[in-house]
């Protein structure tokens, strides 16, 4: 399994690049539009990769950061979401915007991605609602845990999100206490 490739970009297209390693091996790697915008031909970089082996192809998908790679890997595990659709999500939404859409149940944001309709957006949200903590960084994880706890207490997500915008606490326990005071 190839988990990362370091080398010089010898070819760059909007969603594809070729990386030549110091050993002379060149790898063709599919990339998101966001990744493409941040790299230049002739530049030495390291791309984290997800490798997909098929009967007719050995495909590499490249990412500049771990969050985008995790987002891609979570998406391709879902029934009916292939690598091309997952890359379309990576190209259309940052990992933070994607996470926000999952947390808020925002199908409108997900349907802006080519190839994702309302039904698929609802399924993505439903299937990833438990896995969203994997995508979160430390600053978001306590908010996700707080939202989950408050929902378990019977509060509605939209009301919780509005209250959390005005909360200042930086850990789960304090944020739950602060939110409960404002929700009461």
UniProtKB/Swiss-Prot annotation:
InterPro entries: DNA_helicase_Holl-junc_RuvA_I, Hlx-hairpin-Hlx_DNA-bd_motif, NA-bd_OB-fold, RuvA, RuvA_2-like, RuvA_C, RuvA_C_sf. Pfam families: HHH_5, RuvA_C, RuvA_N. GO terms for cellular component: cytoplasm; Holliday junction helicase complex; Holliday junction resolvase complex. Residues 1-64 are annotated as: Domain I. Its main location: cytoplasm. GO terms for molecular function: ATP binding; four-way junction DNA binding; four-way junction helicase activity. Keywords: Cytoplasm, DNA damage, DNA recombination, DNA repair, DNA-binding. Coiled coil: none annotated. Residues 145-184 are annotated as: Domain III. Residues 65-145 are annotated as: Domain II. Residues 145 are annotated as: Flexible linker. GO terms for biological process: DNA recombination; DNA repair. It is found in: Cytoplasm. Belongs to the RuvA family. NCBIfam families: ruvA (TIGR00084). HAMAP family: DNA_HJ_migration_RuvA. Has three domains with a flexible linker between the domains II and III and assumes an 'L' shape. Domain III is highly mobile and contacts RuvB. The RuvA-RuvB-RuvC complex processes Holliday junction (HJ) DNA during genetic recombination and DNA repair, while the RuvA-RuvB complex plays an important role in the rescue of blocked DNA replication forks via replication fork reversal (RFR). RuvA specifically binds to HJ cruciform DNA, conferring on it an open structure. The RuvB hexamer acts as an ATP-dependent pump, pulling dsDNA into and through the RuvAB complex. HJ branch migration allows RuvC to scan DNA until it finds its consensus sequence, where it cleaves and resolves the cruciform DNA. Homotetramer. Forms an RuvA(8)-RuvB(12)-Holliday junction (HJ) complex. HJ DNA is sandwiched between 2 RuvA tetramers; dsDNA enters through RuvA and exits via RuvB. An RuvB hexamer assembles on each DNA strand where it exits the tetramer. Each RuvB hexamer is contacted by two RuvA subunits (via domain III) on 2 adjacent RuvB subunits; this complex drives branch migration. In the full resolvosome a probable DNA-RuvA(4)-RuvB(12)-RuvC(2) complex forms which resolves the HJ. This is Holliday junction branch migration complex subunit RuvA. It comes from Campylobacter hominis (strain ATCC BAA-381 / DSM 21671 / CCUG 45161 / LMG 19568 / NCTC 13146 / CH001A). The lineage of its organism: Bacteria, Pseudomonadati, Campylobacterota, Epsilonproteobacteria, Campylobacterales.
């Amino acid at each position: 399994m190839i988990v990362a490739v370091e080398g010089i970009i010898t070819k760059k297209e909007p969603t594809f690049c070729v990386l030549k390693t110091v050993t002379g091996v060149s790898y063709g790697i599919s990339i998101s539009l966001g990744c493409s915008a941040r790299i230049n031909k002739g530049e030495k970089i390291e791309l984290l990769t997800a490798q997909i082996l098929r009967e007719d192809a050995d495909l590499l998908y490249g990412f500049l950061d771990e969050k985008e790679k995790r987002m891609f890997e979570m998406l391709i595990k879902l029934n009916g979401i292939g690598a091309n659709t997952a890359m379309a999500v990576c190209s259309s939404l940052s990992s933070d915007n994607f996470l926000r859409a999952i947390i808020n149940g925002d199908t409108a944001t997900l349907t802006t991605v080519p190839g994702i309709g309302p039904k698929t957006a609802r399924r993505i949200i439903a299937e990833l609602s438990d896995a969203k903590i994997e995508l979160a960084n430390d600053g978001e994880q306590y908010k996700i845990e707080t939202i989950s706890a408050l929902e378990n207490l019977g509060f509605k997500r939209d009301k919780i999100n509005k209250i959390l915008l005005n909360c200042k606490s930086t850990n789960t326990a304090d944020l739950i206490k602060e939110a409960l005071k404002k929700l009461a």
